[in-house]
Amino acid sequence: MRLGWKGIVGAAFGLVLLAAHTTAPRSAPMEPTSPLDKLVGRWVGEGFLGIKDGKSEAVKCRVTYIPAESTHQLKQTVRCASAGGSIEVQSHIVYSAGAISGSWSELTRNMRGDLAGKVTPRGFQVMVTGTDLNANMNVVINGPKQIIEIQFNNSSLIGLTLVLTKG
């Protein structure tokens, strides 16, 4: 079954954004650190995309985080593939005072949008918006694992659940 690219783009972006948050450090460091620090590197994983007609499709993703201009910013690249196709999303993520914000673009379909969210005790909550995309995401960080859940609004897609592993 072919999924709409808007849904796949949203799902991939959701993964990226959700992965962009980690919990605050447990020990008091001498210098301020960012909850984004633990994200730097490569994450891979898979999950399922739920569709309103009751079907689901397997999805595999690779997410790479590179430090940007400051310790509170990251550049992110997300590549996901399913039977319905593939996407590539690039994002710029900023952390400030417990909040996450930024922008994203899907390179092959020329889609763009914004993200905004907050840090939670176990990860973060984020809202992803774009011209034809609205989604709510929750991310739970547990050591080298990220569990990402995305709920799509006004879409033929219901949601996306992914498990990513750092390495």
Where are these regions (language model features)?
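Central antiparallel beta-sheet cores of small beta-barrel/beta-sandwich binding domains
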Residues: 28-140, 152-166
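Signal peptide processing junction and immediate N-terminal pro/mature segment
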Residues: 21-28
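Bacterial N-terminal signal peptides that target proteins for export
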Residues: 1-12
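Bacterial N-terminal signal peptides
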Residues: 10-20
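Preference for long, well-ordered alpha-helical segments
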Residues: 146-148
